[in-house]
Amino acid sequence: MSEPIRVEKIIPKGQGLAKAVIARALELKLPFEIRNKSRFSETLSDGREAHFFLPRGNVLVDGDILVADDGSMIKVSAANQQVVTIASNDAHQLMKAAYHLGNRHIPTQLGKGFLRIEPDSVLEVMIRQLGLEAIHELAPFEPETGAYGGGHRHSHAETFDSDYALAQKVYAEHEKPHVHGPGCSHHHHGDHDHPHEH
């Protein structure tokens, strides 16, 4: 059994490579969950095992070329996966949906007349409340990457949890009992800055 190959280099969309070179590359179909990682292992189409150590912060997209330490080239393809497609002829409604999804830092694919997200029952309820249909299907998922920093993203649940925890902390700090001493600069009910006349 041959040793696993190591893959570290990305050539975005195969820029600068001849079409004949790209045509000879091994194809590797990956779902978004894996394309969003920098460290993973996969079995290539020729049966070899490959360990990927890619630059952090990158999201692989359909057409990227990866170069292994032995010179092998691997063409990335977006694999079909479970997605929710939001299709409409009403551009304004789609814009509203895109706004709400973006506000929650949800990876979203933008297409002509449709949006596409990963399945999420909470988001699907929101989509339907906006008057749009959420259709489950198998399709490649290629969300916009710029909106969440090239791979760094939070689910809406994580965002809510972190925001809620921060709010709780701020509230706790505000409500913490305060011992007043000579150096305290707070003014309190019943305290006066002016002298009393007796």
UniProtKB/Swiss-Prot annotation:
It comes from the Bacteria. Belongs to the UreE family. Gene3D superfamilies: Urease metallochaperone UreE, N-terminal domain (2.60.260.20), UreE, C-terminal domain (3.30.70.790). HAMAP family: UreE. One of its GO terms (molecular function) is unfolded protein binding. GO terms for biological process: protein folding; protein-containing complex assembly; urea metabolic process. Involved in urease metallocenter assembly. Binds nickel. Probably functions as a nickel donor during metallocenter assembly. NCBIfam families: PRK13261.1-1 (NF009751), PRK13263.1 (NF009762). Keywords: Chaperone, Cytoplasm, Nickel. It is found in: Cytoplasm. The keyword Cytoplasm applies. It holds the Pfam family UreE_C. SUPFAM superfamilies: Urease metallochaperone UreE, C-terminal domain (SSF69737), Urease metallochaperone UreE, N-terminal domain (SSF69287). The keyword Ribonucleoprotein does not apply. Residues 176-198 are annotated as: Disordered. This is Urease accessory protein UreE. GO terms for cellular component: cytoplasm.
